[in-house]
Every structure is written in structure tokens, then in C-alpha cells.
Amino acid sequence: MSETANIGDSHIFDGASESELNSNQQERLEQIRSAVEISREAVKAVSITAIDLLKEIPAFMAGLDFETELVNPFAHIEAPIWEEETVPQEMMEAAYAYCELLTRKEAGNFYHSFKYLPDEQRKAMCAYYAFCRRADDIADGDYVDVFPGSEGAQDPEAKEYRESLELLTGDKSVLDAPTYRDKLAQLFFFRKKLSTAYNCHASTDPIFMALKDTVSRFNVPREHLDDLISGMEDDLYTNRYRTFDDLYKYCYRVASTVGLVCIEIYDYDDPMAVKYAESWGIFMQMTNILRDVAEDAGRNRVYLPLEDLERHGIKPSELSGDLANDKRWHAFSAEFIEKIETYHKRALKLLPLLNRKARYSPAAMMAFYGSILKKIKKRDGNIFHGQIKLSKVEKVTLAAAIYAKQRFFRL
């Protein structure tokens, strides 16, 4: 197979959004995305020998300042994949250390919930979090990913990938052309790195080196990680969602897939855990969306379903203003909160189905987001005045209560 999918049988669908594609078109779109691969020919001359690299890693590990520094231990390798058949243990340890440091610096509440997992699961969660964080940062423009040897947005493969998506969907980006092309190219090469986690190669990006070990240990399906990248790509084309079903599909990609990967790492036996993990992601993402309505509207993004807003007489343009005392908003937010609570209740059913040693992590995350939702509800949906978050005291108190419940009581 070539490194990008053959697009000769694609067709042009003028103006079709992804939600309007029929099943065959949708299947073709996913084939194009999932066919992104990296080949052995991508290896270029490495500027340092394996033995020299191994000599440097102990110094790198010893010199890390876990409070301020985040240093890629393999930044000096000028090739996208490791040329040896196996990755030396020292390199793998450095890759996991990098992911854990990134998680400690960026994850906040999430990292706290990871700390009490068994070591192998904690390391895996940090590797997966690092993957998710980088994908999100690329989509938001907060991070510029590097793929050695590529030409960025002008790279022939990246251009072929972009054109294949546009031919199939007819979608036009909501971003300016240079920004759109740059972000999509980065996500394309991010998919290439992901492919190394599931083939015989190993990326020289520490995140994907650790991720390769993680998905192998815990049998994580690639489709969940591909779906998350697809969700980030959706943000390049869509800044409005007509129906709740449209919003649900987006939430599934960027959040439910996270829950589905987490339960593979946490361990479960009952197949119902899969459905509850899906609801877990929907609950957390919908809470985020409601909390960030005003901020997103200021960036010309409205994730709330337009048909539901219209039913309450609310125009998208009003969301960037102040609806705190508006009865229309009170009615809409109460209805939206009720939906979120439904998914929250389903998500809580996941906890008894997980390995007991892993329950604290998801329980803490659910509790933090549940508390944020309660704050919004108590304020009659007023997300327009002040940032809604938990204080440090609230976090510590809540975490202690959840830990005690998981440690000393049966669910």
C-alpha cells in the first residue's frame, strides 16, 4: 500500500458536510484517514549512532528538572523512525519519562488521578495523555509538531491527503487557508507517527515510542486513536453543529474514544463497560462545552446544537454577549444540563466494572467534572460571569473523599 490512500475512486460532493455523507462515502473517508502509514523508506541518515545515543540518555535523565523543563531526549535524531528492529530499554524509559513529565506539567487534575494507578498503568495513561494533548495542541495552534524530512503543508503526501478529503467531503475550512493547510499537514504527519505504534517501525518521537509499547501491552485498537485525530480535523472544517446527533458524533471522537482507550488500560471484563465508557466521554465533553460557551463563541465556535438554540429563540451571535439573566438561556441551559446528567449517571455505572486498583482514576475525573456541572446548575446556567472551576481546597477535599470511598468501601 502507498503511504496515502488511493483516491482515484473518490467523487466530488459539492457542499456536503461529513454528517450528510452516506454510509459508503463515510466509509471511504475513514479508509483515507486510516490508510495513512509510514514506510521503511522514511528512514534517513541518523546523525548519531545507537551506542552514542545510549550513552547520552543517562545524562538526560539525571539532568531533568521536573518543575520547569520539558526536553525531547531524541530531538537530535534526524529521522522519523528508529532504524534498529528493537528499541533499547534506555530509550523506552526516557520516552515514558518524557510523557510523564509532560502529563505532570499539563494535565493538572488528570495527573493527580493517574498517580494512584499501578506503575505500568500510570505510565500507559501518561503516554496516552501525551498523545491526546499533542493532538489537541496542534488543532488549537498551541504546538507545532515536527516530522523529520517533511516539507510541512507543501509536502506532496500532505497535499494529496488534504485534496483527497476535500474531494470526498466538499468541506471548506473555517480557518484561513495558510492556517488550515498547516494544521491539517501536522495532523497528517501525526497520523504517520501513530502508524508506527501499530507496525514494525518505532517513531523517534518519545510520545509515540512510549505509545507503541502501551498499545501493545494493553491491546488498544488503533481506530480509537485515529478517531480522535479525525475529531481534531473536524474542528478545521466545522464551527457549528446543527443537531444534537452532529454534536454527539464530535464528542464521541474527541472524548468517548478517550474513555474507550482508558478502560483498556484500566482493565475490565463486562462488555457493558464499553457503552458506559462512551457515556463517560460524552458527559465530560458536554460539560466542557457548556462551561466554555462564551469563550468558544468569542472564537466564532458554537458547539451547542443550533436547532436546540433556535427552539429557545437564541441566536448563535448572542452567545458572545451576556445571557446570564435571560430566561431563554435559563430554559436552554436547564435542558442541556439535564442531558449531561443523564450521561453522567450512565458513566458512573462504569466504575464497578473496572479493576478495583484502577477505579480511583476515573472516579476522580468524574467527580471533578460532576462538581463543575453542579456549580453551573447552581448558577442557573450562568457561565458568562467569571471562570467556573474548582478551588484547590475543593479539589483536595473531593479527591480525599473519592480515595477513601474507593480504598475502604465497595461500590
Residue ranges of model-derived segments:
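Catalytic cores of Mg2+-dependent Asp-rich isoprenoid enzymes
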Residues: 2-285, 290, 294-411
